[in-house]
């Protein structure tokens, strides 16, 4: 057994045993030592028995004792070897356990490294997104500041329409240029008898009641944006008229005008122009070249060309319409003044400022002589003429007109101009002089600087825009305090215009809501040819200096027309007698639907005023 152990120890020194080989050899040695221990144990027992026998006989006792001692030492060595082998086996088992734990820890370390890399990637992506977001926020803030600056620039030349603007009054070209307005509905049967008789005397014709009903019905459908119903309705009526009355009948021309209007509201300008040209040919052949209906169609065709930016083509049409109205109505009729305003607009878009001044001055003279100096058309025409002066650099003439407008509005409000009641521009100039003598304390009450703020009660779209335009003119002249006064007054006027009381006062001041005055002064919003068809001059200055194409009437008239015509239509369909109009009958939708957000903008518009151009160039 000992030889086996020695043989294993004599293996070549250069051969390194693996851990498994060491463990196997240790187990073999341990087994050999156990066997050797058992063998020595048996020999020791035999010697002990021999010693007992020798003690009885007394021979060779010392030799036996010596062998026993050697055996005991050998057994002690064997037991020590066994203990060491057991320790080695236990150590090997512990090392195996430690190695297993080590592998587990390594696996965990690998997973943690992967998770750490994932977290780093996620953090890097989040940081990039955060950086992009911060850049976007900074860019949006810059764009916001830029837009706010542009908005402030536009305030010097924007179109201030107060509450009417919110209700849709600022539509570029409303339906009233082809359809009957409030005056026709108010007159009722008197219209068909009076105007019909006049039409008969002058060789005109009277529009049948069925076409009037169709007018109002198409208005309702168009107001609701239901063109898919309005267009087939017009086409069917047109086919019926052509079949029963013939292609050259005036009623066919009327229906062509209605269908052209619907196409125009859909931005189908080519189709609308084709229909209006057909209507013009029919009316010229049936009613004569100098009939008011021909002038109405010419005006509507000029409107269409103006929308497309064809000012040169529109100007001769508008000029011919003016000649017809001068011949039929006289050179001093208010409707001639409206046509002059339209012609001035077309000329201004072509840069013909001398002609623009001539047309505006003539229109202003007609309004003042026929309607009086307090008529709102006078203020609007003065404002338009002042804007024309601004575009030519005639600042003194423009300033004088602006002051006339504000003074007239002030007189209508307070009755006179005295020390206690001064127009707002006088207060502005006084504050300018005071600011030059001593700086104004921003916290001081307004009473210290006079009652200028009381003049802010004078409010209308025309006056409001005049305040802003005159304020811009003051800024050009370096009168900053005066400009701020007018701008603040314009802001107050705009805020006051949002309540019904202020709106009523504005209507009373400028006569925009006075029906009796409109009847006495003549048609202020439209020109109707004999027979009752409306041929209003829809394209004219808005009266605020913006130079946009806009109808000068009020949407309240359209609402009343729609309300009454709707009730009449319902009564006719039900076969009952018409009753007085009920206040509960309302129009189905607002005319704002006609100005769709994606609709092409009106091209016939004025450029910015000179003050705004300078502000834009300086920025």
Curated annotation (Swiss-Prot):
Question: Locations of Acidic residues compositional bias?
Answer: 179-188
Spans of biased composition, class Low complexity?
609-619
Q: Which residues carry this modification: Phosphothreonine?
A: 612
Which SMART domains does this chain map to? TPR
Subcellular location, in the record's words?
Cytoplasm, Cytoskeleton
> What family name appears in the similarity comment?
Belongs to the kinesin light chain family.
Q: How does it assemble?
A: Oligomeric complex composed of two heavy chains and two light chains.
This chain belongs to the protein called Kinesin light chain 4
Whose protein is this, by species? Answer: Mus musculus
User: What's the source species' lineage?
Assistant: Eukaryota, Metazoa, Chordata, Craniata, Vertebrata
